[in-house]
């Protein structure tokens, strides 16, 4: 898989037996600023059980809370989440990041779970 970033929080990778961690994806410029911009790419091998979570900062940013702490918290929630039902997993992650609070920014969450070839 090839990934690029336009300044969003790092995607979080979960691998069976290897743990859960944010991926280092060098950020490019915000989309729309420079039509000729180059975006650095990061390649990640897909293995059965691989899970990748991508989100906008609106999901995890909270005034007065360090962004690195928020990323670490989301990483911990993903590490503990049951992956048998992605809808329920997404609901769990959204709830864990403060679904009850007023959001001040857009929220987007994408979860990819690669089961392997059939």
Question: What role is predicted for each listed range?
Answer:
Residues 1-118:
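Conserved subregion of the PPM/PP2C metallophosphatase catalytic domain
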């Amino acid at each position: 898989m090839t990934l690029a970033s336009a300044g969003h929080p790092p995607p979080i990778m979960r691998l069976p037996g290897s743990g859960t961690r944010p991926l280092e994806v060098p950020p490019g410029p915000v989309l729309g600023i420079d039509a000729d911009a180059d975006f650095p790419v990061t390649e990640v091998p897909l293995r059965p059980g691989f899970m990748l979570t991508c989100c906008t900062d609106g999901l995890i940013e909270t005034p007065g809370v360090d962004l690195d702490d928020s990323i670490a918290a989301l990483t911990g929630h993903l590490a503990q989440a049951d992956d048998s039902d992605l809808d329920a997993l997404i609901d769990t992650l959204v709830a864990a990041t403060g679904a009850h609070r007023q959001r001040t920014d857009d929220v987007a969450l994408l979860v990819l779970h690669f089961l392997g070839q059939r």
